Design a protein with these regions (language model features):
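Terminal helix/beta-alpha structural elements that buttress the NAD(P)+-binding lobe
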Residues: 1-241
């Protein structure tokens, strides 16, 4: 199995450097691996490397019912972290809660900044994880405590517009980072350690991998349409046979 790597995954065969490959445990299927390697290693570096979460912490995590989000829900629960997640439908809210998310905010029906402030008694949270980008960026900053950390790790709604660094000062001496998985698994040792942590949680029953949508390789256009319409939940995979 592998995560990331060179562009060109929409193919029957790939050429991947041997040092980027990982041996799957016998108990984990190829379909599970396809649905968890990129997503699970992303959660590992977000929660265990970039900013090590501790039991009792409270966080905001956008897109809590997506492929990364559902793993994050379960990982946060295993760590004893209170996770406040945002979703775009009642169905997705139920799914996130069922996977361990402590509180869910439906951004279609609620102002997520106001609701988070209510849930935290006006304090905000020390860390926000935002893979949505343009649509949520300003609100995410408003959810942070003074000296809080904004982790912008995706831009599903579009790139974040340019902004002045002085805004970070005026909002409470905030920190911001734009990480990628590649920089947290650049060394073979880092990749193996992250994979072992992920595999261990799956085999221990702490993580259940949701392969929610499966498409034949010739259905890739429909797969993109479904994701762009935000009607998917969990992970989507392409099947080559």
């Amino acid at each position: 199995a592998y995560a990331g790597g060179p562009v060109g995954a929409y193919a029957d065969y790939r050429l991947v450097p041997a040092e980027r490959l990982l041996k799957l445990p016998d108990q984990i299927s190829f379909s599970q691996a396809a649905a968890m390697m990129l997503q699970g290693l992303t959660v590992h570096y977000l929660f265990e490397k970039l900013h090590r979460l501790q039991s009792g912490d409270t966080i905001l995590f956008h897109a809590a019912a997506g492929g990364v989000g559902l793993i994050a829900c379960q990982w946060a629960k295993a760590l004893g972290v209170t996770m406040i997640g945002t979703v775009g439908s009642a169905e997705k809210a139920e799914l996130a809660l069922a996977n361990g998310c402590s509180h869910v905010i439906n951004y279609k029906t609620e102002n997520f900044v106001h609701r988070l402030r209510e849930l935290t008694q006006g304090q905000g949270v020390p860390v926000v994880y935002d893979s949505v980008g343009k649509d949520t960026f300003e609100g995410s900053l408003d959810c942070l405590q003074p000296r809080g950390l904004m982790v912008s790790f995706g831009n599903a709604s579009g790139a974040v517009p340019p902004f002045s660094l002085s805004e970070l000062a005026s909002r409470g001496s905030l920190f911001i980072t734009r990480p990628t998985l590649a920089h947290y698994t650049a060394q073979r040792e880092e990749l193996v350690a992250g994979a072992n942590s992920l595999f261990g949680k799956v085999l221990a029953g702490q993580l259940h991998i949701h392969v929610k949508q499966q498409y034949a390789l010739n259905q890739v256009i429909q797969a993109h349409r479904d994701m762009e319409a935000r009607i998917t939940t969990g992970s989507s995979i392409l099947l080559t046979e």
